[in-house]
Amino acid sequence: MVTIRADEISNIIRERIEQYNREVKIVNTGTVLQVGDGIARIHGLDEVMAGELVEFEEGTIGIALNLESNNVGVVLMGDGLLIQEGSSVKATGRIAQIPVSEAYLGRVVNALAKPIDGRGEISASEFRLIESAAPGIISRRSVYEPLQTGLIAIDSMIPIGRGQRELIIGDRQTGKTAVATDTILNQQGQNVICVYVAIGQKASSVAQVVTTLQERGAMEYTIVVAETADSPATLQYLAPYTGAALAEYFMYRERHTLIIYDDLSKQAQAYRQMSLLLRRPPGREAYPGDVFYLHSRLLERAAKLSSSLGEGSMTALPIVETQSGDVSAYIPTNVISITDGQIFLSADLFNSGIRPAINVGISVSRVGSAAQIKAMKQVAGKLKLELAQFAELEAFAQFASDLDKATQNQLARGQRLRELLKQSQSAPLTVEEQIMTIYTGTNGYLDSLEVGQVRKFLVELRTYLKTTKPQFQEIISSTKTFTEEAEALLKEAIQEQMDRFILQEQA
């Protein structure tokens, strides 16, 4: 029989008493009253904050958006199919935040910054709030450095600066995403981090963009945040803020970033869906009253930081889709009023073969020539003026039968200038190539060619200039000015190439 040793038992009891830690945990809980359509109504959660994350019994996370007298309206970050009426919900005491780090470069993530490219977890040591305050007035400085898109029409006439917000607006299938992806491709070697946010897009379209970026080696400095059309409205609404938080991480580390929101019309629709299901009063076009604030608080996060904060920048290119060219609809007018200019893509121009289909007449950059190098300013001023005069003349010439020689020459020049603005997709040009192209057109060197020969001649001229006159590129990249020496080299190259080209065509 086992002997009972009283001293051993008393020691064990004493140890247990010493180890006992009386910790009282107060948990703010509630009960599900109703769930459906990505919305849950919760009774309880008395001390929940607006925007706080709440956790359901089966693991789904939601955001408390409506704090009403007798219940809390929560939007779900998942399908919530396992949530049952009467199940418990607890407040987490946290607001939505995501992990951030350099390791995100080259990855495709969702609105919660979780990888969706099948390449494993992403290590991160730091967190940022998805919704953080925009830099104040003192934290900013005016935009002065150019962000080159590689598209002649934009860099010469609608220049974009680092820290600017430039809207890309147009009907569906007019090349809005193409302008944005070309801009990402052109940042290669420019030390700019790019973030592409796809909101409510088809998964196939997002895959196509990612493939293009991978093939051209652009994914190594790009992060893709994707919430496709089948994602819950809550995640489509959050995706742009997640992208902004990732871009801010680099901006506050003295880096330059470019963020593309493709597109904000879909985010507004997702927010409208959430708001209507939460029974918030609808306003114009059934959007809620705070849909302006939805976009303004997002786009105000783009900035050029002051020198005391390291001069980092975040340039935003939001995309908005219009219905049959109606720029005066609710969301387009809102975003136009928030941004520093817009690039308008026209379906008519696109269908007539002018690509990128930029309508230079109603596109504008409110930063203007502050975002151009001196060399570009020297050659681009003439281009904009001549194109404006050409557009006016072209409309008039449709009604006039006999035109004088000067008018005919001006029309011919305008057609060739319009031709030099055409570019193939995924073929951005360097600043030096753009300056050379514009100079050739505005100084009448293309007037002797047929309109159909212009692009072929310019492609050959770029190659010829690069191989035989490399000093031209060196002068412009080092001095940022179109010097007399550079002009002499360019004139020489144009003349030599023109002679060669005419001989080729005759042969």
Swiss-Prot record:
It is found in: Plastid, Chloroplast thylakoid membrane. The record marks 363 as: Required for activity. Pfam families: ATP-synt_ab (PF00006), ATP-synt_ab_C (PF00306), ATP-synt_ab_N (PF02874). InterPro entries: ATP_synth_asu-like_sf (IPR023366), ATP_synth_asu_C (IPR000793), ATP_synth_asu_C_sf (IPR038376), ATP_synth_F1_a_nt-bd_dom (IPR033732), ATP_synth_F1_asu (IPR005294), ATPase_a/bsu_AS (IPR020003), ATPase_F1/V1/A1_a/bsu_N (IPR004100), ATPase_F1/V1/A1_a/bsu_N_sf (IPR036121). ATP binds at residues 170-177. The keyword DNA-binding does not apply. CDD domains: ATP-synt_F1_alpha_C, ATP-synt_F1_alpha_N, F1-ATPase_alpha_CD. GO terms for molecular function: ADP binding; ATP binding; proton-transporting ATP synthase activity, rotational mechanism. It is a peripheral membrane protein. GO terms for cellular component: chloroplast thylakoid membrane; proton-transporting ATP synthase complex. The keyword Transmembrane does not apply. Its main location: plastid. GO terms for biological process: proton motive force-driven ATP synthesis. Its EC number is 7.1.2.2. It catalyses: ATP + H2O + 4 H(+)(in) = ADP + phosphate + 5 H(+)(out). Keywords: ATP synthesis, ATP-binding, CF(1), Chloroplast, Hydrogen ion transport, Ion transport, Membrane, Nucleotide-binding, Plastid, Thylakoid, Translocase, Transport. SUPFAM superfamilies: C-terminal domain of alpha and beta subunits of F1 ATP synthase, N-terminal domain of alpha and beta subunits of F1 ATP synthase, P-loop containing nucleoside triphosphate hydrolases. It comes from the Eukaryota. Gene3D superfamilies: 2.40.30.20, ATP synthase alpha/beta chain, C-terminal domain (1.20.150.20), P-loop containing nucleotide triphosphate hydrolases (3.40.50.300). PANTHER family: ATP SYNTHASE SUBUNIT ALPHA, MITOCHONDRIAL. Produces ATP from ADP in the presence of a proton gradient across the membrane. The alpha chain is a regulatory subunit. NCBIfam families: atpA, PRK13343.1. F-type ATPases have 2 components, CF(1) - the catalytic core - and CF(0) - the membrane proton channel. CF(1) has five subunits: alpha(3), beta(3), gamma(1), delta(1), epsilon(1). CF(0) has four main subunits: a, b, b' and c. Belongs to the ATPase alpha/beta chains family. This is ATP synthase subunit alpha, chloroplastic. It comes from Solanum tuberosum. The gene is atpA.
